[in-house]
Amino acid sequence: MTTDAVQTMIPTLDVTERPAPRPKVEAGVKLRGAEKVARIPVKIIPTTELPKKPDWIRVRIPVSPEVDRIKSLLRKHKLHSVCEEASCPNLGECFSGGTATFMIMGDICTRRCPFCDVGHGRPKPLDVNEPESLAIAIADLKLKYVVITSVDRDDLRDGGAQHFADCIREIRKLSPNVQLETLVPDYRGRMDIALEITAAEPPDVFNHNLETVPRLYKAARPGSDYQWSLTLLQRFKQMMPHIPTKSGLMLGLGETDDEVIEVMKRMREHDIDMLTLGQYLQPSRSHLPVQRFVHPDTFAWFAEEGYKMGFKNVASGPLVRSSYHADEQAKLVKAELLGS
């Protein structure tokens, strides 16, 4: 297999450990871009400009009455969508189709992953009214499939697991037929209590992204652990064998195709049912640089290999994100699991 990829930037990571200044950050203050990544242990040298995207990765500007309507509804209920916070390239398509991925527990993350466009800082206390507000918004939108994700909340005793459970419970009160997928954080140091809470109010699909290959964790996911994330997914599957588990990777951070295949094998060893693979897009000059744009043919090859390994569904393409067409993927996988 010859990888057909467009190589773009020379790596600009300085992996030398360096002391980072630690000015006190006030609660509720969101750090983004250079301010955010200045606090990680690996120095990132800003690129002079963002790389030019190939033709296959360009998307239309998300402008339509439906996009405006959903944004207005989110503001009305003081909710956040990861579609906006993470600058998702599929925002226009998903919003225009009347769907959205909701981000709970605020819009300030306690982690500072330099690939991500969500702000970092000291979060405010949880909004106790958010589960009810989210349930009302979903009922107003008449959604049939909802993805709930969150910022990392390392400040919470359970990592936010109870808040996820509260949201699921309130949503099902008002929309009993809705299908719910949760895209959860890694619950670092809190796995036991988080899984106990999750099992009491489980979603219809349990998703947690590995994001990248283990060699790049120090640069891309400071504060996270590759094996911990795999174990989280496997332990949930052992507790709830009929609920699909799902994970995903971004490509273009400097990984090799062989490394991607190895991670896919490890996912299957940990009983992960569904896989998403998409192209990493650099949110700003201060974020991790794009090392390559992976050709659609290579994404198609990864999908073929994934099905050979036993994944029940593989979504692999330049614009694929973890919640992209999640309803269609989950329907097929759940039917197979329930029939097995």
Curated annotation (Swiss-Prot):
GO terms for molecular function: 4 iron, 4 sulfur cluster binding; lipoate synthase activity; metal ion binding. The keyword Signal does not apply. Its main location: cytoplasm. Its EC number is 2.8.1.8. InterPro entries: Aldolase_TIM, Elp3/MiaA/NifB-like_rSAM, LIAS_N, Lipoyl_synth, rSAM. This is Lipoyl synthase. PANTHER family: LIPOYL SYNTHASE, LIPOYL SYNTHASE, MITOCHONDRIAL.
